[in-house]
Amino acid sequence: MFKGHPKGLLAAALSNMGERFGYYIMNAVLVLFLCSKFGLGEGPAGTIYSFFYAGIYLLSLVGGLIADRTQNYKGTIKTGLVIMASGYVLLSIPILATSGNIGWLLPLTCFALFLIAFGNGLFKGNLQAIVGQMYDNFEAEAAKKGPQALAEAKDKRDSGFQIFYVFI
């Protein structure tokens, strides 16, 4: 399946799959967690969820601007992964707290959600840009070999993005 594609495609696809796995699982239980752990009603829990979800899309713009200004897409992606992982670790702290004063855990949870959204903003769009750059480089190398090789390389871009999106 990956034969004839740039070597980084597998790593990009697996990174994307891992990130989406964690994201969708967390999204599936977030409102239930907020209601059961903190005793929030559906309205306040839904508001937190809505702000988190909106933050993911708004912070993607910020992540794109940062990557464009620095021209360091790989560094931005790595930073996003570290920030997201930090958010997931912080999000696990309230799960471990079983009794006592847990009032401080709701702000911690909201901060963890912000970290996840910001890390996602740094990671998601820039990973797709890196995949596009891989194929730009792949096509440039193929162009040196002739028009037939270039045509084959251009066909690989479409199937490469198809493979990449299957891993979402």
Language model features by range: what are they?
Residues 79-105:
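C-terminal ends and interior cores of transmembrane alpha-helices
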